Structure formats: C-alpha cells, structure tokens
Amino acid sequence: MGMQTYGNPDVEYGWWAGNSRLAGFSGKWLAAHVAQAALIVFWAGAICLFEVARYTADVPLGEQNLILIPHMASLGLGIGEGGQIVDTFPYFAVGVVHLVSSAVIGAGGLYHSLRGPAILKEGPARAPKFDFDWGDGKRLGFILGHHLILLGLGALFLVLWAVFFGIYDPVIGEVRTVTSPTLNPFTIFGYQTHFVETNTLEDLIGGHVYVAIIEISGGLWHIFCPPFKWAQRLIIYSGEGLLAYALGGLAIMGFTAAVYCAFNTLAYPVEFYGPPLDFRFSFAPYFIDTADLPSGQYTARAWLCNVHFFLAFFVLQGHLWHALRTLGFDFKRIPAALGSLSEDVVDAKA
C-alpha cells in the first residue's frame, strides 16, 4: 500500500515528492530518514560553530540573534554567576561533536541507501522485524514504540543532567543541581491549563520525569501490544493518513513551544533570550518584543517564538490537506467544480 488512499495506486512520483517515492521500500525509507537525521545534526553543529564565531561579550546575549548558544547556556554550559558566559569552549565542543556525529549518521544513511536491502524483510538479523506495510497496525505500532522510547530517553537525559550536573536557575542567577524534582502528580498535572506559569526548576524537571515515564511506558506498550479493535476502527492505516496524524501532532508541539518561549522566563531565561513578548494580531497573529531595540533588531526569543509559530501554522495546513485526502477528498476536482459553477452563473445571467 502506497501513500495515497484513493485514485491511481501506481502513481509515479517525481523527485520533488520526497519520501513518497520510497513508500513501498522500507529499506530506502529508513535510509532517507537516517540521512535526514544527519542533515539535522549537521545543521546543529554548523550553526553552533557559526554562533560561537559571532558571539561577543559586549552585547546582551538575547540581542545577538543567536538561538543555539542560549539553549546551551540554559543547560548551564559555560555559565558563571549572574548568568554571565565565562567560557565559550563548551559551545565549540558541542558543535564539533555534532559535526562528527552527523558524518557517522550520514554514513549510515549512505549504507542503507547504497548497500542495504531495499526492503528490510530481505535483510539479515533483526532487520525484517522493522519491515512494515502501511496497513499493518501491529508492525507500525512496533516501530512507533521504539520512537517513543527514544523520546523518553531524551527527556530522561535532561532529568539526569539537571540532577547531577545542574542547569541555570534564573531565580537565583546561578547554575544549580535539581536534587529533588517535583513528583507529586497533582502539582505536575495541575499545570495543564496554565503550563506557561511553571516557575521552579523542581516542577520543570519533575514534568520531564513524567514525560520520560509516559513515553517509555507507551513505547513498551506499542512494542508488545497491537492496537485495540476500537483504535483500528478509528485510525486510517495508510501512508498519507499516518502523515496527517504526524503533521497534526507536530503542529500542536510547534504552537506549544511558541507560547512557552514567548512568555515563560524559567526555561527561557531573560538573560539569554531577552524579556517576554507581547501577542499581537494583524493580518496574522504574531509576537513582538517588549525590549527597546533599534529598528529591525529582534531578540532571540522573538526569533524562536515566531519561527515556531509560523512553521506550526503551515504544518497544520499540511495536516488538513493530507487528512482530507486521506478521507477521499480529491483537490483536483476543485477547478472543475469552480468551472462548472461559473458556467452556471453565466447561463443564469444569459
């Protein structure tokens, strides 16, 4: 089963169609995703080194149009008292590690593209376990489970980093360890309606403890348990359907990140990102700086927030597009429908 859910099942996709060309080849699909991961890691490393070269101690960090150094600073790297950057070598090291990692991951992408099996079912060892068909909910759940576990481990890594190495606390202006994360579920889940107001590192890290538990538990569940009957009836198992679900989730995360970045000063300290933003609405919603800056200059917070917001907006349009196509709506019929409608109007006037 390919990406489409209706029409011609044997569509010939052009190069611009991206991964749609590989929908029937699980090995090539894996190669594309590994290569894309390499590009992401390469971007992180290259931009990190670029920012290190541009950084100056004479201008507030939030006003230097940097987006990666503030993130690393909030993790406590290179930070002294009062949130001052005292050492940029950790940022350089992080950039180099990412560049080297991107080469290793890229080599994996090349291997799976040039030497690995086009279909994982034909591969050696455990490779066939990751072969999939778009209509096989059990196998797709198995693969989803591994993704969820990796996400959970990422959240757990942040928790361990905060507990053993410490992160920057804007309340006291110092890097400190979080030895007692909040584990009270009523406190953590009480933030659901006002999560932007998280104001202690204990609550922030405690929330990541729950995220790690939920992600890893959910991953194990999906690995060992096939979808329930009611879930199979609700979910449309097709390449385009799953793409629509993924884009919808990505849009939600983008909007959430934008709002959190705009207004929360615990995870996004003023020292590194600039002051909180104001929300405005003109032709489209947007966030503006409250800091007094020269014309055409913006804080790191404004850049991060607005980029996340507008990317989430367009990703949401992609979700709606693919969801409608999944349900059988053919956008190619719209011009014909509009043409017949205009002809009816002309005939009525005649």
From Swiss-Prot:
UniProt keyword Amino-acid biosynthesis, yes or no: no
UniProt keyword list: Chlorophyll, Chromophore, Membrane, Photosynthesis, Photosystem II, Thylakoid, Transmembrane, Transmembrane helix
Transmembrane helix listed as a keyword: yes
UniProt membrane topology term: Multi-pass membrane protein
Subcellular location: Cellular thylakoid membrane
Cofactor stoichiometry and binding remark: Chlorophyll a.
Essential cofactor(s): chlorophyll a; chlorophyll b
Primary subcellular site in the record, as a coarse category: membrane
Family the entry assigns: Belongs to the PsbB/PsbC family. IsiA/Pcb subfamily.
Protein role: The antenna complex functions as a light receptor, it captures and delivers excitation energy to photosystem II (PSII). The Prochlorales pcb genes are not related to higher plant LHCs.
NCBIfam families referenced in this protein's UniProt entry, alphabetically: PS_antenn_a_b
Other notes: PubMed:8986795 speculates that the protein is probably 2 residues longer than sequenced.
Protein name: Chlorophyll a/b light-harvesting protein Pcb
